[in-house]
Structure formats: structure tokens, C-alpha cells
């Protein structure tokens, strides 16, 4: 490819390069943030869910944002989606400001990329901004038509994209760290947890409990070291990520009631009060173990309206409908036996 050919395709090369960098950035460096975003919502494929969103200003932008976030269940998909949004933002900027130098048309894309790193700012904001940019890009060139377009578009834009509001949410400094440990807990990466903690000890109580559990799983520490009094401290549940960590710790230790409570704490910690597909999945498991079968069926009915939990819900339903099958389940039966022998406890 000659210099002239490269110059003529400079924009395409820049976009392709940025897209690859963004995909790698999210997939290799921040998969924990993508997965926690996915765990912080419950997108349902039914008309009631759509109607619940669309009846409020900005609900359509929220619906589209949550539709996209459900695919973060696989981090590579999240990287692809963010890369696509980056390209769309650059192309819309170029269309709105055709005389702007090429490199400057990337500024809105990089700003949206930076915003995406803040966990408490949902994808709704990015979608709403792109919707408004698209509406501006479609402005007619004739003055009369443009005025009519703006008059009609203003209320439509307000309803679809929603109003803007800004408020300060103090993000706990250990939140991202807890998300990383939460991902390793889900992957059962016990060696990685121990190595990371030994390299850089954490002040997070949840991370400390996770490191002790990992040490036990590797045979480094005895089981007695796990049953400390502070394992029931509510200081371990100060964020959504830490609550999910403790849910895993309690569940693997056979403290099923505590796992259930930590799961509820995680769901209540979601910033916009969404429900969580990941949390409901765990609540199905705890309900099966504690023999609350009608409750398990209720949660399974909800999960069957999702894209990425539907198959698991269909496979698990027979256990709730015919509890005798749980006796043949290698995990649930052993946890049921541990639950029956374990004294219940409460947070303090």
C-alpha cells in the first residue's frame, strides 16, 4: 500500500486501530467492570419491561442501554459494543462538523470512553448523547424545514433521550479492586487470588475473606481460619462487588442463609435500584437448597425472560418441580447437607 493510498484511507485506518485498541482494553484490562455492569441489571424480553421504560422521559435511552449491557455477559461482546459506539460517535461528530480536522472529530468518542470507566454512570448516558447527536445530524438544510423539525423534535428528543442531571456519588476506592477479586472468585482462580493478595494486601474485609478462602482451597491454611467472628460483619457488605464476593464465600462454606442475605444486599446496592440476573440465579440456588421450591420457581420464571440466563433456568426448573432430583445433584445435595448441620447466623 503506497503513501497516497494510506493517506486516502487515513480515517478508516484510525477507526480500525482505535476499535481494536478499545476491544483489547475492555477484554484484557477491564472485564470485571463489564461483568459488574451486566450483573447490575435484569433485561427482560417482554412487552411489560419495554412499557415500564418507555413511559418515563429518557426511558427509551435506558432501554437501549440496558439492551446492550446484557451482552456484557461475555466481556468480548462488551468490547465490541464500546468499539461500535466509539465509531458511531466519531462519524456523527464528523457529519455535524464537516470542517473540523479529522483528529478533533475523535474527541467526543474519547470523552464517552472515559465516562464508561465510571461504574455509577450507566450506558444510558452514552446512548442518550448519541441519540441527540443523530437528531442534530439529521437537521434539514432548508431554514423553514429546519425550524419545523426542531419544533417537532424537541419534545420527542426530551422523551426519548431524557433530561440531564448531575450529582456527585462518592465511589469507594476499593470498588474496582473488589470487582477484580469478584471476577477471580467466579472463575475459581484461587491461585490468582492468593498471589494478588500477597503482592498487594487489601483493606477490604470482603477481599480478605476471599483470600483466606482461596488459601483454604489451595491447602495453605486450615478450615478453622475461615470461621472467624468478623466473617459475619456487615463491613464486608459495603458495596455491590463486596456483597457478591461474600455471597460466593458464604455459598462455598455452606452458609446458605448468609449467602442469600449477601445476595439481597448486592441487589439492593445497585445504584439505580435495578434487579440483577446474576443475583436471581443465586437466589434460585439458595431456594433449592433451603427447600423453598415455590420461591425458586418464581425466580426461574423471571430468568426465563432473559437472553443469557434462559438456558440455565430451563435446565434447573426440573429440580424445583421435582425436588427428589436434587439428591442426585453433586453440588446442591452436599450444600443441603452442610446447611442442615450449620447453625444460622446474622450480620452484626
Feature-to-residue mapping (PLM):
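Start-transfer (signal-anchor) and selected internal transmembrane alpha helices
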Residues: 1-22, 146-150
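Membrane-interface micro-motifs in multi-pass membrane enzymes
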Residues: 36, 40, 54-58, 73, ...
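Helix-to-loop transition at the C-terminal end of transmembrane segments
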Residues: 25-43
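Soluble catalytic regions of membrane-associated enzymes that act on cell-envelope
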Residues: 170-336
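Internal/C-terminal transmembrane anchor helices
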Residues: 145-166
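Short hydrophobic/aromatic helix or loop-helix immediately within or flanking a transmembrane segment
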Residues: 54-72, 84-85
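Transmembrane-helix motifs of polytopic, lipid-linked glycan transferases
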Residues: 83-99, 109, 134-136
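Structural signal for the C-terminal ends of transmembrane alpha-helices
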Residues: 26-30, 93-97, 134-145, 161
Amino acid at each position: 500500500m503506497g503513501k497516497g493510498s494510506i493517506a486516502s484511507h487515513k480515517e478508516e485506518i484510525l477507526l480500525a486501530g482505535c476499535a481494536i485498541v478499545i476491544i483489547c482494553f475492555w477484554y484484557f484490562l477491564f472485564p470485571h467492570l463489564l461483568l459488574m455492569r451486566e450483573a447490575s441489571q435484569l433485561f427482560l424480553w417482554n412487552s411489560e419491561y419495554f412499557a415500564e421504560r418507555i413511559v418515563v422521559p429518557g426511558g427509551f435511552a435506558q432501554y437501549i442501554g440496558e439492551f446492550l449491557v446484557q451482552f456484557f455477559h461475555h466481556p468480548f461482546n462488551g468490547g465490541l459494543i464500546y468499539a461500535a459506539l466509539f465509531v458511531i460517535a466519531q462519524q456523527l461528530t464528523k457529519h455535524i462538523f464537516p470542517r473540523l480536522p479529522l483528529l478533533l472529530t475523535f474527541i467526543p468518542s474519547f470523552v464517552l470512553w472515559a465516562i464508561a470507566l465510571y461504574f455509577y454512570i450507566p450506558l444510558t448516558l452514552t446512548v442518550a448523547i448519541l441519540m441527540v447527536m443523530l437528531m442534530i445530524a439529521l437537521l434539514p438544510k432548508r431554514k423553514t424545514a429546519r425550524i419545523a423539525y426542531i419544533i417537532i423534535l424537541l419534545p420527542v428528543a426530551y422523551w426519548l433521550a431524557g433530561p440531564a442531571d448531575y450529582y456527585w456519588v462518592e465511589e469507594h476506592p476499593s470498588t474496582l479492586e473488589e470487582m477484580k477479586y469478584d471476577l477471580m472468585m467466579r472463575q475459581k482462580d484461587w491461585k490468582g487470588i492468593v498471589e494478588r493478595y500477597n503482592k498487594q494486601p487489601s483493606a477490604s474485609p470482603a477481599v480478605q475473606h476471599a483470600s483466606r478462602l482461596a488459601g483454604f482451597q489451595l491447602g495453605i491454611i486450615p478450615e478453622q481460619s475461615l470461621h472467624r467472628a468478623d466473617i459475619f460483619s456487615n463491613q464486608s457488605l459495603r458495596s455491590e462487588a463486596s456483597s457478591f464476593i461474600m455471597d460466593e464465600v458464604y455459598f462455598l462454606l455452606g452458609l446458605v442463609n448468609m449467602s442469600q442475605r449477601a445476595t439481597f444486599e448486592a441487589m439492593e446496592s445497585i445504584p439505580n435500584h435495578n434487579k440483577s440476573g446474576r443475583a436471581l440465579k443465586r437466589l434460585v440456588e439458595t431456594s433449592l437448597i433451603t427447600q423453598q421450591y415455590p420461591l425458586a420457581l418464581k425466580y426461574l420464571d423471571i430468568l426465563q425472560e432473559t437472553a443469557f440466563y434462559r438456558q440455565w433456568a430451563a435446565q434447573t426448573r426440573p429440580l424445583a418441580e421435582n425436588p427428589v432430583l436434587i439428591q442426585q445433584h453433586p453440588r446442591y445435595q452436599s450444600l443441603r447437607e452442610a446447611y442442615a448441620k450449620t447453625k444460622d447466623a446474622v450480620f452484626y
